[in-house]
Amino acid sequence: MAFDVARLRALYPALQSGTVYLDGAAGTQSPSSVIDAIADAYRRGTSNGGGFFDSSVRADYDTVAARDAVADLVNGDPRGVVLGPNMTTLTYRFAQALSETWRSGENLVVSRLDHDANVRPWVQWAQRAGVEVRWADIDLATGELPSEQYRELVDGRTRLVAVTAASNVLGSRPDVRAISDIAHSANALMYVDGVHSTAHGVVDIEALGADFYVTSAYKWDGPHVGCLIASPELLETLHSHKLASSANDVPDRFEWGTPSFHNFAGVAAAVDHLAALDDAATGTRRERLVTSLLAAERHEMALFKRLLAALEADPRVILYGKAAHRTATVYFRVSGFSPDDVSRELAAQDINVWSGHNYAWEVTAALGIRDTGSAVRASLAHYSNDDDVDRFLAAVQSL
């Protein structure tokens, strides 16, 4: 393996400033290759797709290239990749489409571990459709989402199960495959939020059993583009509320309005960058992604082990969540300080962390901290290094 974090960090202009970016769960920094791809798309001239002239042909090329890249990233079918402004918008779009197939007396299952973007769209459209919403609860001691509870929650009237592949605050990774097996045994669809998880390991939507998988490129070094991946056959069954003049093919029928073609160039560049995190990776782009993301996960978790051990040793620190299987993300409070105070003090030392609920609305309510500022989140990325961890720990200890 050749995962060289020093080599990697040199590729990111933002990392040259000296700032410690422990806010990867909110959005990652972009390497020069992604920035250049987007800038080049502007420089060569921009157009809508579907035309016969060069800039329009290039816009179509960038769209296809982005779909191909996202499909490689998650082991999906490029014909089923829907590109949009963000995961929240796409989820609302598909909640509307799916709700038109629901009937009174049916139900769907959401979880209290999820980001609100994989909760509220389903709850709101279920209410409009007269469909029951059932809740999967977290284990408050560990921050895990026990999969066995789904055997009681899912029945023959369940139409959809929405669950995260990793909590954006606790880092907990549910057993998505076990949950999907239960859902599919009742012929329910699985909608998996991969926004937080995608950057932190290898994704295989087939292995997960995800009928729909959503992710956002800005969480893995790319621009602000949301991605939904499903089988094209499943997409064909869904109605899209769109302009009469818009394409009716899939995935195009779900891509409303004029797309961000220049950002699509950045999506493909970001996936190519991820495939080269380990510069010894060989084979197809998918094979290089697997090698590189495994190496990146090992790197992140080695750093995180040291960071977490130091926080656990500090008697002033209160930690939330201790899942056995997790991402390199920690959610904590420091006795005597509000979460905002901690975040503000670290910002003064040029260390970026987030305080607050981070849209984990149900998680923070279940933990009993939502009304008191929630907690502080520190999240590592593949470009994090020992110095980042050292400076973070020193700053916390200085409080």
Segments (PLM) and residue ranges:
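Pyridoxal 5′-phosphate
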Residues: M1-L399
